């Protein structure tokens, strides 16, 4: 049964990975054709800054998955429930730390971005920050699927979300070439 689940997880993860790459490429092409190139640079900078802040997780996910294996194998639902409550608190704390650290970085954004003509750049960053930080408030649940060898369920949900987001972003860029709308969609989907 474990081999069957593992192969199913690999198959769905591979499909999801290639789908994500293709969708990101299409969205990036539409992005470059619809908005000034400066927005692409800002988008990349914010992505890198927030990836650095996401290091706050520091390997919590593998520890969660490892601690769930035994109670799931023995069907100890009380232990699973209590561990999930603990992980929920940990992930909410991590999300709050990321948001707080990100807010503390706002005064130094001008140091990273010189001579820009883009108005509202700090608001753009704040929306990116919320998108990253708030994702931790519910992402702890994924670890239960991984520990239960049902990663394919997560892959399906992520793929559907990626498709919806990509289609909405492409439509938004083509109809209303607005960076505001582009990043707000990231927060909503």
Q: How would you label these PLM feature ranges?
A:
Residues 1-24, 78-85, 121:
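N-terminal membrane topogenesis motif
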Residues 2, 47, 90-189:
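Hydrophobic transmembrane helix module of multi-pass membrane transport proteins
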Residues 8-28, 40, 161, 185-189:
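Transmembrane helical elements of multi-pass membrane transporters/channels
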Residues 23, 27, 44-72, 91-94, ...:
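Small-residue-rich midsections of specific transmembrane alpha-helices
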Residues 25-40, 110-114, 173-175:
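Helix-terminus/linker motif at the lipid-water interface of multi-pass membrane proteins
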Residues 31-55, 179-184:
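Interfacial/gating helices of multi-pass transporter permease domains
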Residues 32, 68-73, 110, 146:
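Helix-terminus/helix-capping segments at the ends of transmembrane helices and short amphipathic helices
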């Amino acid at each position: 049964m474990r081999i069957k689940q593992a192969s199913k997880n690999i198959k769905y993860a591979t499909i999801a990975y290639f789908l994500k790459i293709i969708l990101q490429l299409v969205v990036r092409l539409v992005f470059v054709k619809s908005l000034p190139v400066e927005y692409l640079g800002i988008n990349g900078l914010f992505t890198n800054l927030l990836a650095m802040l996401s290091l706050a997780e520091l390997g919590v996910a593998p520890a969660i998955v490892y601690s769930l294996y035994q109670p799931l194998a023995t069907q100890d639902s009380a232990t699973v429930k209590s561990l999930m409550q603990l992980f929920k608190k940990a992930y909410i704390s991590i999300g709050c730390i990321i948001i707080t650290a990100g807010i503390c970085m706002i005064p130094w954004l001008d140091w990273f971005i010189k001579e820009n003509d883009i108005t509202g750049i700090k608001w753009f960053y704040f929306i990116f920050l919320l998108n990253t930080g708030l994702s931790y408030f519910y992402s702890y649940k994924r670890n239960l699927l991984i520990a239960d060898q049902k990663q394919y369920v997560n892959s399906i949900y992520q793929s559907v979300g990626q498709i919806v987001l990509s289609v909405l972003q492409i439509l938004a860029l083509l109809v209303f070439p607005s960076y505001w709308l582009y990043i707000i969609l990231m927060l909503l989907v």
